[in-house]
């Protein structure tokens, strides 16, 4: 597919760096043409993308790909699936990471369950894991399995592990409870907080004991965050179980700077 005539409808930046001379009718027709040929157009657009460090402009291709990603879910659901699958397939080709990152971000807008496995592969790729995680969290359907698989592969990389823990916590994945509990004893503060957050998201009363035990060990910023996560946990529990959290806060927060936490806990008990 010769994509260039379609791209010519999209503006190039003026010398001062802003898009100018936008022909709305022309761009609308261009997007319609892309939607009418979603698979071929997606591949052709992906092939036009360049790494930002290389010479030449790909602004029109980026504009077209993003505009279509926004429009196609509304205009034609069947075409959306084909377009998303074609973009996802392009991730398997040899391309600069920053190009793949851009494509993944478009899938965040227009992708569905059909592309989660293609995106999930990048949860263990430094530099692309954040983009992949954000896309999967936007799609949701099928994302949990990708985060679980990535977590198993990222044991030696704290950042990648945190990325997957964050995804599983955000999705309130109950089956990941053992991983959240394991994270509570990690040497890294951020990892421990992700473990606490995960438990507060799942809100299983059976995990209150390890949650409160871990909370008691935290200091400084993590101690404050842990208390707030405790309150969130309590909001999802029965009155009886929630009271355990509030009593714990009252008993453990003795510093002047923690007075407000005690007041909140006492108010919740009454």
What are these model-derived regions, one by one?
Residues 20-60:
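N-terminal, post-signal-peptide region of Sec/Tat-exported proteins
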Residues 33-36, 63-71, 103-109, 135-138, ...:
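Core register positions within helices of long alpha-helical scaffolds
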Residues 86, 127-131, 159, 163, ...:
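Beta-propeller blade termini and top-face loops
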Residues 94-98, 105-110, 114, 123, ...:
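Internal alpha-solenoid helical repeat scaffolds
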